[in-house]
Every structure is written in C-alpha cells, then in structure tokens.
Swiss-Prot record:
GO CC annotations, alphabetized: chloroplast envelope; chloroplast inner membrane; plastid
Protein name according to UniProt: Plastidic glucose transporter 4
UniProt entry keywords in alphabetical sequence: Chloroplast, Membrane, Plastid, Plastid inner membrane, Sugar transport, Transmembrane, Transmembrane helix, Transport
Signal peptide bounds: none
Pfam families per UniProt: Sugar_tr (PF00083)
Molecular-function annotations in GO: transmembrane transporter activity
Lineage top rank: taxon: Eukaryota
CDD domains named in the record: MFS_GLUT_like
Species this protein is from: Arabidopsis thaliana (Mouse-ear cress)
SUPFAM superfamilies registered for this protein in UniProt: MFS general substrate transporter
Length: 546
C-alpha cells in the first residue's frame, strides 16, 4: 500500500516550489500537479500497464493453478514453520487440498479493491482541482485555508485507520466495507456541492475517514480470503487499484482548463464507486476466518464453498478450527496489543510503516521536478512519465516475485537499493568532482530510488501486516500500524521543509540513507518470512517464537 504522502505534502511542495523554483504562475500550477502526482509514488506505481504482468503472475503462481479464475489446489503437505526469534518450530498443515477447486476468489477481490480505487482517487483528486476550487470558494490568496482543505483528508484518514480495525472485528469485514461506503459517498457529495470552505473541509474529513478505513480493511480482507499459493500476488493487486484511482483522478482533471467548474464533477463522481462498493459487498462472502472465530461455522462453510469450492469445505473448516480460529479466547482489546504476548509482532508492523515514511520518499517527490530540470528535462509530463514507468516496472517485478522471492527478501533488497540511491543523490549535490555530471546522476539516483521503493518498501508492508498478526489481534493491529503511518505522514509534512531549510537537502538525503540502512538491519533481525505459508502457519511460528 501503500502509503500516501500526498495530502499535506502536495500543498507544502507547491509553496516551496513557488518560492524557490518558479515565479511563473502557469509553471507553478504545473508544479502542483507534478509534485502531487509523484508523491503518489508512495502508494505505489501507476501500475495500469502492469495488469498483464499481474495476470501472468497469477497464472504462474502455482503449477496446480489451471486458470486465473479457477484455482487448483496443490497436494497437502506438512510445512515446517520456523519461528522468528527463538528458532522454535511447529508442524502445520497448509490450507490446501488435492484436486481442482470450483470456487473463485477474484471477483470478490475486485469488489474489495473498489475501496483501493477510492483511496487513490481521493488522494489525487484535490491535486488538479485545488487552484480552481480555491477561486470558486474565494480563498485563492489564503494558503492556510487551502492547506486545511488538503490536510483535512489526512486527519480523517488517521481516525478512520484506527476505527476500521474495531469495526471489522465487531461487524465483520464485508459489513465494515458497507459502513465505509457511507462517509466515502457523503464526503464526495459534500465536496462536490460545497458553497463554503467549512463544507468542503467537512467533506474532505469524511472522505478521509473513509479512505482510512479502506486502508485497513482492503488488505485485511484480501489476505484472509486469498489461497495461500497466490496470496502475495493477490495482495499486491491492492497497489494496482490504488494507482488506478490515482490515474483516474489525474485524467478527471484534464477538462479543468476549459471548464473551471469541472472540479465539482471531479469530486462528485467518487459517489459512484462508493455505492458500487456497498452493493458489491452485499453479495460478497464474509471472511471464513472471522466467521469461524465468531463461532459461525455454518456461515463459514457457505463462504468457503463460494471462495474455494465445495470440495474444500470440510478440510478448511477443520484446519481453521484446529489452528485456534474457532477457540473461545475472547477478542483482543486495544491494550492487548501492547502486552508481552503481542507487542513484538505489533511493533514490527508499526516499524515497517515508520521506516517507509522516514526513508525519504517525500524528499524524492518534492525535488524530482528540479532534479529533472537540472538534467535538461523541462517537461513535467516527461518527468512524470519516467518516474511512473519506474514505479510500474518495480511493482510489476515485485508482484511476480512476491510468492517466489518472498516478502522479507524484497524488503531487504528494496531498502538496500534506496540507501544506495540516497547516497548517490547526496553526492550528486555536494561532490565537486561530480559537478559536470550532477544533473544526470541526480536523475539516475531518483529513478533508482523510486524503482527500489516500488520493489518492496511501497507494496510489501500493507501485504505483510495481515499475514504476521494473529487472528485475535489482526484487525486492530493492522489499524494501529496504519494509524502510525498516517500520523508520521502528517508530522513529516509539517516539519520536512523546515529541516531542509536548516540542514540542506544533501544532508537530509544522507540522513535518509542512514534510515534505510537501519531498516535493512531491523528487517533482517525481526521480520519473519511469510512466503508459502498459510496465515495459520505464520501465527503458529510467531506464537511459538514469542
């Protein structure tokens, strides 16, 4: 998932670029769009052209898979799950069976990803519309109120990310999606019809609550209904649809130059996928894991039949119950996340998102326009295309390797590449011996950084979190980790430009390189590999190692 640095930073980047790089208003306006567009790299690449690669990944994910829409199960076999710390081992039976499955998962993953589309769309829609809505609402000269319109989405998302876990545990995953559609639709409607700044901010706040809930439950639901063999590939689809939402927002802004009031339509159109999400989830199966955990075994059997086929009902219900999903242990409370039993794994989830935000994606986003111009690339569109292509390629590669190379390996490779890229960027600005090549080196460093980020640091955390958390704490722990993401995102947005002004961009880049190195060391020592394991196997491994 990605994560999102757009909201506060788009506005801050605009102010900085207007002050530093351009005095021409039209150029500044382009700078807003470009900076916002690239900051979406933190949510993942513009992955639209990667759909063919995704299809190939799904088709190759396991030799037993006969087609993308009909999953074959591989032979059941014992897998020795190694614990993450003490080296203890547990024998577990994966949720697999022999024979061809008559169920299908993809349509329901697609419905869930409407939430991801809305996530990306609401992040990106204000980027092109801000200048026009500011004029329409009479705040063209008031950058403070413009900042509130932008950043209120982040505030709402922080609330939503914490709320999503509790709702998912209490009402179930599908019902929470339906509840989530309410603030998403109302927020979009208020923004589209706003006649005052106050109404606009309330609309953005509600939309933020909606995308905050989506950021928690979309990866959670997908991970819980996906077959073990292709869970990594399906989990990375979340990134794809976030980027489709971002791209849709970018395209939706094209008529603005000819029709300044088009910004209202841009916000209003988001009501449609919100309604479709609510309707689609009314026909989608609930997570079998949640149902068994609630003691609703008969409903779980129906969900398993829909998702995996009637051939697997008995086997999967038995395995889910045996793994502890059906135990009478009460649902975990928020304070349980900080207990000695769970804190280690919860801290891993929070740390991954903190490293993601502190590793410098914001700096690369902010300065990419000036970096490309220093290399003679004057077109913002060309620069965006280059950064976008790097994102597309990186995530396409990551999705194809997710179930082969593994999540942990991708994270290590990603943060290692980001560290080297940051070092190259820092040297390109300060090392006089490289002055003649500084522009070219800066572009190379930027592209390599974005490519490295999209290989692991961008897409893996949102996929990994639902996998490493025990079923009893999964929803709340995912929500807590994503809440840390939104909070750190907001804080970085407030102080980043001040730090750059005081220390200089080269020193800041060097600091980011150090953070990436720390991330590599932390991941190597604390993150457990989840490739090829069922969620039950992972839970056994982490519990035995606690």
């Amino acid at each position: 998932m990605q994560s999102s640095t757009y909201a506060v930073k788009g506005n801050a980047a605009f102010a900085f670029q207007r002050r530093t790089f351009s005095s021409d208003r039209s150029t500044t306006s382009t700078g807003i769009r470009f900076a916002g567009y690239k900051s979406l790299a933190t949510t993942g690449p513009l992955y639209c052209s990667g759909s063919e690669a995704m299809g190939a990944t799904l088709a190759r994910a396991d030799n037993g898979i006969q087609s993308v829409m009909s999953f074959s199960s591989v032979k059941a076999r014992s897998v020795r799950a190694q614990a993450s710390s003490d080296g203890d081992e547990e024998e577990a039976i994966p949720l697999r069976s022999e024979g061809k499955s008559s169920g299908t998962v993809l349509p329901f993953v697609g419905v869930a990803c409407l939430g991801a589309i809305l996530f990306g769309y609401h992040l990106g829609v204000v980027n092109g519309a801000l200048e026009y809505l500011a004029k329409d609402l009479g705040i063209a000269e008031n950058t403070v109120l413009q900042g509130w319109i932008v950043s209120s989405l982040l505030a709402g998302a922080t609330v939503g990310s914490f709320t999503g876990g509790a709702l998912a545990d209490k009402f179930g995953r599908t019902r929470t999606f339906q509840l989530d559609a309410i603030p998403l639709a109302i927020g979009a409607f208020l923004c589209a019809t706003a006649q005052s700044v106050q109404t606009m901010i309330v609309g953005r706040l509600l939309a933020g609550i909606g995308i905050g809930i989506s950021s928690a439950i979309v990866p959670l639901y997908i991970s819980e209904i996906s077959p073990t063999e292709i869970r990594g590939a399906l989990g990375s689809v979340n990134q794809l649809f976030i980027c489709i939402g971002i791209l849709a927002a970018l395209i939706a802004g094209l008529p603005l130059a000819a029709n300044p009031l088009w910004w209202r339509t841009m916000f209003g159109v988001a009501v449609i996928p919100s309604v479709l999400l609510a309707i689609g989830m009314a026909f989608s199966p609930e997570s079998p894991r949640w149902l068994v955990q609630q003691g609703k075994v008969s409903e779980a059997e129906k969900a398993i039949k829909t998702l995996y086929g009637k051939e697997r009902v008995v086997e999967l219900v038995r395995d889910l119950s045996a793994s502890g999903q059906g135990s009478s242990e009460p649902e975990a409370g928020w304070f349980d996340l900080f207990s000695s039993r769970y804190w280690k794994v919860v801290s891993v989830g929070a740390a991954l998102f903190l490293f993601q935000q502190l590793a410098g994606i914001n700096a690369v986003v902010y300065y990419s326009t000036s970096v490309f111009r220093s290399a003679g690339i004057q077109s913002d569109v060309a620069a965006s295309a280059l950064v976008g292509a790097s994102n597309v390629f990186g995530t396409a590669v990551a999705s194809s390797l997710m179930d082969k190379m593994g999540r942990k390996s991708l994270l290590l490779t990603s943060f290692g590449g980001m560290a080297l890229s940051m070092l190259l960027l820092s040297l390109s600005f300060t090392w006089k011996a490289l002055a003649a090549y500084s522009g070219t080196l800066a572009v190379v460093g930027t592209v390599l950084y974005v490519l490295s980020f999209s290989l692991g640091a961008g897409p893996v955390p949102a996929l990994l979190l639902p996998e490493i958390f025990a079923s009893r704490i999964r929803a709340k722990a995912v929500a807590l980790s994503l809440g840390m993401h939104w909070i750190s995102n907001f804080v970085i947005g407030l102080y980043f430009l001040s730090v750059v002004t005081k220390f200089g961009i080269s020193s800041v880049y060097l600091g980011f390189a150090g953070v990436c190195v720390l991330a590599v060391l932390y991941i190597a020592g604390n993150v457990v590999e989840t490739k090829g394991r069922s969620l039950e196997e992972i839970e056994l491994a982490l519990t035995s190692g606690a």
